[in-house]
Amino acid sequence: MPSKQSDIKKVVLAYSGGLDTSIILKWLETTYGCEVVTFTADLGQGEEIEPARQKAILLGVKPENIFIEDLREEFVRDYVFPMFRANAQYEGLYLLGTSIARPLIAKKQIEIAKKTGADAVAHGATGKGNDQVRFELSYYALDPDIKVIAPWREWDLTSRTALIAFAEQHQIPIAKDKRGDAPFSVDANLLHASSEGKVLEDPAEEVPDYVYSRTVNPEDAPDKPTYIEIDFERGDPVAIDGEALSPANLLTRLNELARVNGVGRLDLVENRFVGMKSRGMYETPGGTILYVAHRGIESITLDRGAAHLKDELAPKYSELIYNGFWFSPEREMLQALIDKSQEFVAGRVRVKLYKGSAVVVGRSSPYSLYDQDLVTFEEGAVAYDHRDAAGFIKLNALRLRTLGKRARKIAAAQKA
């Protein structure tokens, strides 16, 4: 018998197939007495997705209520690439690998809820983190009347021991390595992998090397640098070393190139939207190359005013994504401006990968605003008259000279 009386008849659960969401699946059935539909997204997390189907069937979910989708291309094309056009970095460092995945998962849950006639959705995010906000803001933006169940905010399973006991009571399979407290929690997709908690909670301690899963230790990377060329069209990468690739395949290739060269590690203390600071370890191998390369092609194709405006707006755009406002009108407004700026962001960037670093070492574009005749120090340059700089400087100095005169008057009056 369910312990909660509810008008919820069917719920769509974001289901990974892991222990926590399997416990949530059974908890939803026993607590709400509702039918559970599972949705598992393949975002390139690097794990087998199909076992989630078998796990759900084992736990009593009807086969027709199990949804598994390969979203890798959609994820990179419609979420990752638009974000990278903006040069988005939360607090100047974090490339938003977890944040950008949540809107797509939420969108698919709402679509499945409509398809199956479900009246609620559920997620496995904890009550302390940002993901609960990201999921639920997206749910409500897409379906204002949807009911949301957040088990971690409701249940009394407050310890690992209690979770294991619940799993055993309901015959949920438990891997041996899941019986003790996990040393850290992990989130992963094609863009990144992140680890938080336990061994990482003391920000004074160095991250143990075993935590890293997607990059070799930069100290162990090859002693010879790797050079790659990335082609861009309208701000998006389209080819590596002359080979055209789909969005997901391109990011996969960049991930591998970055992995062997130890590129993309970040040890970060960030300000969560819910108000606390947290320490996390992020690996964004291919994304780190992409960020550097995109800024490289923009450096020769964007006008100064447009480039500086983008840089002013990037923190706001990044914050919106981090906080869960992907579907907000202000994010969409900023996206339209950003996409307009990318019309001529096309060309080729050469990047050097070496022992943890990714550095632009060359860039070219048919739309380049870089004019060698203007900047050369050699004789014969005809497009620029050095004498013109005098008037430019005098005009820009006018307010500074006026302020200086006032300061001199004040100083003289104080001495009198």
Swiss-Prot record:
Pathway connected to this protein: Amino-acid biosynthesis; L-arginine biosynthesis; L-arginine from L-ornithine and carbamoyl phosphate: step 2/3
Major site of localization recorded for this protein: cytoplasm
Domain of life: Bacteria
Any GO molecular function: argininosuccinate synthase activity
Transmembrane parts of this sequence: none
Name used for this protein in its record: Argininosuccinate synthase
Family from the record: Belongs to the argininosuccinate synthase family. Type 1 subfamily.
Keywords of the record: Amino-acid biosynthesis, Arginine biosynthesis, ATP-binding, Cytoplasm, Ligase, Nucleotide-binding
NCBIfam families membership: argG (TIGR00032), PRK00509.1 (NF001770)
EC nos: 6.3.4.5
UniProt keyword annotation of rRNA-binding present: no
HAMAP family the record matches: Arg_succ_synth_type1
UniProt: L-citrulline binding residues: 94, 99, 130, 134, 185, 194, 270, 282
Keyword Amino-acid biosynthesis: yes
Self-association and partners: Homotetramer.
Binding annotation for L-aspartate: 126, 130-131
Protein encoded by which gene: argG
Lineage start: Bacteria, Pseudomonadati, Pseudomonadota, Alphaproteobacteria, Hyphomicrobiales
Sites where the protein binds ATP: 14-22, 41, 124
Pfam families, per database record: Arginosuc_syn_C, Arginosuc_synth
Subcellular location: Cytoplasm
Reaction(s) catalysed by this chain's protein: L-citrulline + L-aspartate + ATP = 2-(N(omega)-L-arginino)succinate + AMP + diphosphate + H(+)
A Gene Ontology biological process term: argininosuccinate metabolic process
PROSITE patterns noted in UniProt: ARGININOSUCCIN_SYN_1, ARGININOSUCCIN_SYN_2
